[in-house]
Amino acid sequence: MVFTRAEAVADGVSDSELKSLLKRGDHVRLVRGVYADAAELAGWEEDQHRTRVMGVARISNLLVSHISAAVLHGLPVPGGDLTEVHATRLGVGGNRHRSTRHVHSGIVSPEWQTTLEGVYVTTVARTLVDVAKTQPRLAAVTAADAALHRDLCTYEEITDALHSAYRHRGAPRARAALRLADGRAESPGETWTRLALTHPSLPPCELQIEVYDEHGRFVGRADGGYLEHGVLWEYDGQDKYHRLLAPGQTTLDAVLAEKRRESGFTELGWLVVRVDSSDFRVPETLRRRMLDAIARSSRPGWLPPTGSWAVMPRHLSMQRTSLTA
């Protein structure tokens, strides 16, 4: 719970009692005059940042923006810098840094402003542009993938937000990152894998491939692959089996179903490459594994998989809109 000193006093907590709570470690000070339960800062980094953002928003007439807005919108930002709370003071002065806050200045038109849990915050599309201007590519693309996958914004809205920030510092960087966004990614791990495999040494991969047997029966859907080479790839994250759980299923049920699905792929002649978080440390090793798998198709006697396949189409708006503004 985030609360102000005035709210604590109104509830009968004296300044000396508040100091005792801080000294014992039950509560922490977020900014001057704003406090939170210490337990709320003991979770994941994004949760800690969210609590700090809510604290700053309680006493400041600011528009929460950039990576802090992404956290409020519930977007993943792996590799992003969460050491400071980011907000924008509209049209006043220059950027200001404090130990825990980065206050930007600039013009954010009303169409790119919204409220979330009573806090003024940039819209999802504008947030994605600001993140892409200021954070690593992985954080920017992962946030954009998640926003598109959850239908929190559209490709057109991102394009419009890019146009509105056309002259901003970092705009070319933002355009380059957001051109890579793809709402078919179902997890940050899938985004990372796709970016790692987007490399001159590898051909472009397809995403969300539905595989069918010779009789047209659905076998399963793979995260990605190289269709001409008979290669599929699957990202195995910690949350994968939770996402696969059907009502009434246990984790064991999901694991067994996953094994049957992979067996179905291999019986049709597909080669399945598994990817997990250990690959994050050395992406070059993953690319070599994928190249080795692809090379199989050039060997004498290789036969393509039987059955059929279909690629889940990219969002319809992407077919009409180019993120090259």
Language-model-detected regions and their locations in the chain:
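Short gly/ser-rich loop at a beta-strand->alpha-helix junction or flexible surface loop bordering the NTP-binding
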Residues: 1-172, 206, 295-325
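Surface segments flanking catalytic/ligand-binding clefts of nucleic-acid enzymes
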Residues: 14, 148-325
